[in-house]
């Protein structure tokens, strides 16, 4: 059964497994999320639920969104996301989705926006080799050849060049849920997940599981 939840990355720590080995984990505050809208194949053409997470001041929400929340009679939420499901009959508008929908040992996909690195050169951005560092060398970290001269008289599209690095939507696939703490709405994911601390993440069933 498909399922998903929204959360906030709190940071990383480590726990011990049954064998006494240290396991690095990412702590995610997962929910509680509120169902804002329910979509059905009869009306919208597909089955899905729209959920919200996190508090937000009223002055930061525009009028159309305020009306959308008012229609479902739910509080204003900072993050809104839609999850497509095979069956939405078990969900009602206003219902809460909590961290206990997942269990330890399950495989999930975690999506977020990766850390921004700013403007970077080809060495850091693409792993290019640097030039000679010895006396007489005219280039060290500069870009090498970028294309032909008179033919083709241009630089090809998609050439790996310096530029903005990071701050892109990123998903890590098939990672394991190490532990769930339902009373605190925490999910511990084995390893790292995209984004800085306090960033918004989406946790869904693994597509590869």
From Swiss-Prot:
Residues 141-164 are annotated as: Disordered. It comes from the Bacteria. Part of the 50S ribosomal subunit. Forms a cluster with proteins L14 and L19. It comes from Clostridium acetobutylicum (strain ATCC 824 / DSM 792 / JCM 1419 / IAM 19013 / LMG 5710 / NBRC 13948 / NRRL B-527 / VKM B-1787 / 2291 / W). Belongs to the universal ribosomal protein uL3 family. SUPFAM superfamilies: Translation proteins. This is Large ribosomal subunit protein uL3. Pfam families: Ribosomal_L3 (PF00297).
